[in-house]
Swiss-Prot record:
Non-essential, abundant cell division factor that is required for proper Z-ring formation. It is recruited early to the divisome by direct interaction with FtsZ, stimulating Z-ring assembly and thereby promoting cell division earlier in the cell cycle. Its recruitment to the Z-ring requires functional FtsA or ZipA. Keywords: Cell cycle, Cell division, Coiled coil, Cytoplasm, Septation. The gene is zapB. GO terms for biological process: division septum assembly; FtsZ-dependent cytokinesis. This is Cell division protein ZapB. It is found in: Cytoplasm. Its main location: cytoplasm. It comes from the Bacteria. Belongs to the ZapB family. Pfam families: ZapB (PF06005).
Length: 79
C-alpha cells in the first residue's frame, strides 16, 4: 500500500516538475517578446521625434516661402 502511495506521489511530483519547466520556458519566451516590444517602442519614439522635428522644419520653410510669395505678389500689384 505504501509503495502505491509513493508511486502516485512520484507521478504528481514529476507532473509538477514538468509544469514548472514548461512555465519557466514560457516565461523566458515572454521576456524575449517583452524585450523586443520594448525596443520597438523605443525605435518608434525615436522615429516620432525625428518626424516632429522634420515637420517643424517644413512648417518654417513653408512660412518663408509664403512670405516670399506675399512680397512678390505685393511687388506685382505695385506695377
Amino acid at each position: 500500500m505504501s509503495f502505491e502511495v509513493f508511486e502516485k506521489l512520484e507521478v504528481k511530483v514529476q507532473q509538477a516538475i514538468d509544469t514548472i519547466t514548461l512555465l519557466q520556458m514560457e516565461i523566458e519566451e515572454l521576456k524575449e517578446k517583452n524585450n523586443t516590444l520594448t525596443q520597438e517602442v523605443q525605435d518608434a519614439a525615436g522615429s516620432r521625434e525625428a518626424l516632429v522635428r522634420e515637420n517643424e522644419q517644413l512648417k518654417q520653410e513653408q512660412h518663408v516661402w509664403q512670405d516670399r510669395l506675399r512680397a512678390l505678389l505685393g511687388k506685382m500689384e505695385e506695377v
